[in-house]
Amino acid sequence: MFGMLRALKTHVEAPIVVATRAASTNAEKLEEIRERLAKGPNFQDFVQNPDNSRSEWENYEGKLRREKGEEQRLRLPPWLKTTIPVGKNYAKIKAQMRELKLSTVCEEARCPNIGECWGGGEHGTQTATIMLMGDTCTRGCRFCSVKTARKPPPLDVNEPVNTATAIASWGLDYIVLTSVDRDDLPDGGSKHIAETVREIKARNSNIFVECLVPDFRGNLECVETIANSGLDVYAHNIETVEKLTPYVRDRRAHYRQTLQVLTEAKRFNPNLITKSSIMLGLGETDEEIESTLKDLRTAGVDCVTLGQYMQPTNKHLKVIEYVTPEKFKHWEERGNELGFLYTASGPLVRSSYKAGEFFITSILENRKKRQNATELSKE
């Protein structure tokens, strides 16, 4: 009997000893891996190589344009590689977005500049772009990664107050409100957007508010509602040149309709700053870009941004061309020559990218120019 118990004890203890040794070995291996990871390159090194200097940009010999009929995607050039988002302010904003069930176009549209805008950069203006009326759009533009549906969920009646409450706690200098298209609503959601603006201004009258809004299918009553809501900047994107509009944008969006919306917004409120944005790299020509810029100026648009189109998923339009930083610099200079209050042009520039910094810097520069001109006239 005792012999059987000793044998059983031996059989029980043996697996325990083996398991303990295995656990010890695994722990040592895990510690070794952690040490190697700590000393080696991290994930951010793979996302952005610190050696990607301007000389590397200039010496880049990769293919920048896809030929007609060519299916293979272009390789991403070095000037389009960005850092992953980090920082306390970034984490704070993201956490509150989740808590208050708010959406941002920064996340939904997979913007590459989210960390820089939310964090404010080293000396920059903190900017966030909140997407109102949910995360589902009634339109299906071929460049956009936002979800689509014919009848999205109903509006959240608490969203205007929740949005204003969050913004007041962040201490932002500049807020951009954008929205999905809501063709399923009689007013396209214009009253909802206007109410949000008023709630924000009630809590902080000094914050700059920009609204990047839909075309409301050309309904000028909706445009007037937004224009007189108390916002500072009325933005509506033309997106691309006239020839490519039917191919790039939803069939309900029209090039001339966009120009009319921008023109009428200024008429309803002459004190507004109006703004629009153009994506490059979809196959447009220089002549077509020039024509679009002139059309925007004729419509009274004050500010324009130009940025590189980047394909969000395999289901979206392919990039035809990666435009060089030098070419973007050319369009910035050309925009200034045409009389825009400011032109933000660069590969990673988006409609609301560092909107506050570009806007405020431009305003200050223009004030300084006027001051210098006044001093010269007195001499």
From Swiss-Prot:
InterPro entries reported in the protein's UniProt record: Aldolase_TIM (IPR013785), Elp3/MiaA/NifB-like_rSAM (IPR006638), LIAS_N (IPR031691), Lipoyl_synth (IPR003698), rSAM (IPR007197)
Entry GO CC: mitochondrion
SUPFAM superfamilies registered for this protein in UniProt: Radical SAM enzymes
Main location: mitochondrion
Domain Radical SAM core: residue ranges: 122-341
GO molecular function, one term: metal ion binding
Binding site for [4Fe-4S] cluster 2: 137, 141, 144
Annotated Pfam families: LIAS_N, Radical_SAM
Cofactor(s) needed by this chain: [4Fe-4S] cluster
Domain of life of the organism encoding this protein: Eukaryota
Residues given in the record as [4Fe-4S] cluster 1 binding sites: 106, 111, 117, 352
Enzyme Commission number(s) of this protein: 2.8.1.8
Pathways involved: Protein modification; protein lipoylation via endogenous pathway; protein N(6)-(lipoyl)lysine from octanoyl-[acyl-carrier-protein]: step 2/2
Further details from the record: This protein may be expected to contain an N-terminal transit peptide but none has been predicted.
Xref: NCBIfam families: lipA, PRK05481.1, PRK12928.1
Family membership noted in the UniProt record: Belongs to the radical SAM superfamily. Lipoyl synthase family.
Protein name per UniProt: Lipoyl synthase 1, mitochondrial
Organism field: Drosophila yakuba (Fruit fly)
